[in-house]
Regions:
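Transmembrane helical cores of multi-pass ion-transport proteins
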Residues: 1-306
Length: 306
């Protein structure tokens, strides 16, 4: 019993150290306060974890939905985003009660992986700009067009800008993440490589006295709670709200169930109840949307660390 508690405690620490920067990073990438990412991570870990159909899955905000969230905020506003996430939760609960989980399993993994890969390329291009200390465009094609110029500015910062310092930090971080897996000491592999990259980048930035823009938390973190009002609920059956909710429901549910399948293959002790898992995700998303959080899905990065 003591050994089980020790293992679970260590796993929870590792998952926390992976999940927290991930939640904060996704919030920032979406242009939302860090509260949104943290509260969705809390709900995913506690609420969804209590009702989950897979004991090893660690739900939380997912990078695969960043572009959709940014587009919704740009076209419909933040208030509609939270209403959409609330509706996503209700739809997932409905689909779970109607035993739709098995139908999501019928979707070819190649389709979902291809869709997520396409989203991943767009995210990579926008975050590549940020890594080189350049502001990304909202347009995917413009990010491609500006790629060579920002690389040139990073290698030869003729205007005296610190692009090369950001570039150096990014390259060292990526090298740490990739190189960590090749260390001869296997015990060190228990520490996630992404966490090592974050620690190294933070130490480097502080040691070199870089001019860092810190995240502004504010004196009262919980003052950022943005409850859905009765006036917001009046837009629940708006066609744009419903369409966007269906899109997020499909992507989030498919990604969650694919992650569950992957976990089942990774562990002999895991067998997912797919309908129960969708209902759990629905409870989490409806609560997250109500409190101003991000959409919650099962993500392999956090779950693999568990």
């Amino acid at each position: 019993m003591i050994n089980i508690v020790k293992k679970d405690f260590m796993a929870s620490i590792i998952v926390f150290l992976v999940a927290l920067p991930l939640a904060i990073g996704i919030s920032i990438a979406c242009g939302l306060p860090i509260y949104s990412g943290i509260v969705s991570g809390i709900i995913g870990g506690i609420v969804v974890g209590l009702f989950s159909g897979n004991s090893l899955q660690v739900p939380g905000p997912a990078a695969g939905l960043i572009l959709i969230i940014v587009e919704i905020i740009h076209t419909m506003g933040v208030e509609k985003l939270f209403l959409i996430i609330f509706l996503v939760g209700l739809l997932q609960i409905l689909f779970g009660l109607m035993s739709f989980g098995k139908w999501f399993r019928a979707i070819s993994p190649a389709i979902i992986q291809g869709m997520l890969a396409g989203i991943g390329i767009s995210i990579f291009l926008s975050q590549f700009h940020i890594m080189l200390d350049s502001k990304p465009n909202n347009d995917f094609l413009l990010n491609i067009k500006d790629l060579l110029s920002i690389i040139y500015n990073s290698v030869l910062p003729l205007d005296g800008s610190p692009h090369h310092l950001a570039c150096m930090t990014g390259i060292i971080t990526i090298a740490c993440i990739i190189g960590w897996k090749f260390l001869p000491c296997k015990k060190l592999h228990a520490i996630p490589s992404a966490l090592v990259g974050i620690i190294v980048a933070s130490l480097l930035a502080n040691f070199m006295h870089f001019n860092i823009s810190y995240i502004q938390v504010g004196q009262n973190f919980w003052s950022n709670i943005n409850f859905i009002s009765p006036q917001d609920l009046s837009n629940l059956f708006n066609s744009s709200v419903i369409i966007n909710a269906l899109v997020i429901t499909f992507i989030a549910s498919a990604e969650t169930l694919l992650t569950s399948t992957a976990i089942d293959k990774m562990s002999e002790n895991s067998k997912t109840d797919y309908d129960k898992e969708i209902i759990a995700q629905g409870i989490g998303n409806s609560l997250s949307g109500f409190l101003g959080g991000l959409p919650i899905t099962g993500v392999i990065v956090r779950s693999a660390a568990n």
